[in-house]
Amino acid sequence: MKKLLIALLVSTFSFSAMADGHAEWWKKAGAPYAGTVLQGVAENTPPGQFAGEVLAKDFEALTGIKVQLENTSWDSMYDKAIKDMEANSGIYDFVYIEQDIVYDYLNRDFLVNISEGLANNPDLQAPGVSLDDFTTFIDYFKDGSGDVFGVPMEAFIKVYLYRKDLFEAADAKASFRAQYGYGLAPATSFEQYRDNAEFFTHYCADNGMECWGTTVQGHTGHPASTYEFLESIGPSFGLYNWGVNMDSYQSCVENGGQLNGGRAKAALNFWTQLLPFAPPEALQSTWSEVGASFAAGRAAQGWVYGENAAWIATDAEKSAVVGNVGVMLPPTAPGVMTQAASGNGYIGYFDGGAYGIPHSSKNKEATMLWLQYVAQNEVQADWAIAGGRITHKSTYADPKVMAVDEQADGYFTLMRDTGFLYAGAPPFPFHGAGRGAIDPFIYSALAGEMTPEAALDGACAALDQVMADLGYQN
């Protein structure tokens, strides 16, 4: 169905993109580079598929420049991009830059300054395209001078999804109240979330349904689980910036950090204790499998990335829960929402990424045209519908997006109105090395090989060692 949806969008999209009044400019600008093949690598997500299967084809029809976008797994994408840039081999003309890794890339001077490149090449500046049209998410891809090094192609929040049909079932309501002493409802606290998870696991089993009480992004061999803890579960308990003291770059409590503090340990205990109420695939689930599990009706509730929320709620050929998806902010600990609203914390991760140009690219000018093409306001609405992402301010008011928003229980409205409560990853140039040091401890806690307390004591010590070795600690 995903390919069918994209095919249907192609038939309507191409005409609208070419009718923006600037088709002749694109043809003229692309003429010197006609026949050029741009190689790109990105993660295989719904937004990435739309870019490769729709936008790239329309761009080629206008300019004669072919875009070959290799959408692959997160692991492979990261590995291929960074090896290419480290070796300066020039295999890729553009790469996907995840928000959380951009500081590492900037620190290592991997990327072309797009603002500077366009300023120095006025003939390449597309009419009607302005970097000012983006939401504030573009700020994550700027350096200290405000220059842009990546053009955002996806941005979304991680929301709480729940099954309306299960939560509204009369027998479920009666049984829950009898068992727990209060009314069944989507969770606004962790205690309620845990009760819901326990209840629906038994309710589904008693009614012969293949469903459980919650999703868990708990892969024991993939960084997705570490990210889930550091960027979703932890912040909702009040653990920010990985528990790192941003003045001293220490993460252990005894040195002024918080990674093994009370909030962190409460968060990891809560999360690992959900595993008995999660589908069997939980310990092999990344963000993709979580989306698939929820869409298959295998969970009553869960933290789910927005790139999946829209199709889960609207794509009847791919999702078994269309018409029954509720969307809310995730539960938070007392005080967290206040801290987030005042800018002193955040409730979860504002995820997304951008396309950037490596210094090693052999086709920088042609790639500048491609990145501006995907930055047009005119292409954003269909892209948002296909991938649950919004990078431009005007997209929220597009009639097509508003129609899908209604079907998706107000997901886009929620992102627009509460996105300020979320935040991107902390600005750590050592992001990859630091997260890698934490990974084995999160895996061990999920696998039951270490207690959450011991795992976080080990994780903070390992992270502190990385920061010390790299010279960050005072």
Language-model features and meaning:
Residues T72-K80, T188-Q192, A282-A296:
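Short helix-initiation/N-cap motifs at beta->coil->alpha
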Residues D20-P32, Q99-V159, F229, G326-P331, ...:
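Hinge/lid segment of periplasmic solute-binding proteins
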Residues A23-A29, P46-K66, L161, D165, ...:
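Short, polar/charged alpha-helical segment
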